[in-house]
A protein has these predicted regions:
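Nucleotidyltransferase catalytic core that binds NTPs
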Residues: 1-158
Length: 158
């Protein structure tokens, strides 16, 4: 699938200069729906010596109990929760404490500049030929621009 190939290449470009990240095609090779807990189990079986971190938007901590087999995620990794908005940090700390107490979750809140970035925003800006600089690594922005990815999306809607 062409779209998958582009996503894989953009991730490869984004992580290539950071030795702490590694591109895995594990889920991309599957023909079925993939659940986080299952992927973590499979990684632990393949690479038991590794320590795993799962990065998600901190707002997901409020809905994670609705995820399929969510309890299986907590013992498998440390969750790194990135703040995506200015949600009350008191509520966030209370939710983290709740998950740690009730599910023995290991959760760290990532302190980073608050940037309103979403894949939808990036695709829409690229489709409108607007800058996506600082939203994605330069190598990814160059790739999107060079191949004119997402520009057809607007034409298809018209």
């Amino acid at each position: 699938e062409e779209a998958l190939a582009h996503r894989v290449e953009m991730v490869r470009l984004a992580v290539r200069e950071n030795p702490h990240f590694q591109l895995s095609l594990h889920e991309a090779k599957k023909d079925c729906h993939s659940y986080t807990y299952k992927t973590l189990q499979e990684f632990h079986a393949l690479y038991p010596e590794n320590e795993y971190f799962f990065i998600l938007g901190a707002d997901s901590l409020f809905s994670i109990e609705q995820w399929k087999y969510f309890k299986e995620i907590f013992p498998s990794c440390t969750i790194l929760a990135a703040m995506r908005d200015d949600k009350d940090s008191f509520d966030m700390q209370r939710q983290i404490q709740y998950l740690e107490t009730n599910y023995q979750a290991k959760i760290e809140l990532l302190q980073a500049p608050l940037l309103e970035i979403s894949s939808t925003t990036i695709r829409n800006r690229a489709a409108q030929k607007r800058s996506i600089r600082y939203m994605v690594p330069d190598s990814v922005a160059d790739y999107i621009q060079k191949l004119q990815l997402y520009t057809k999306r607007e034409e298809e809607r018209s």
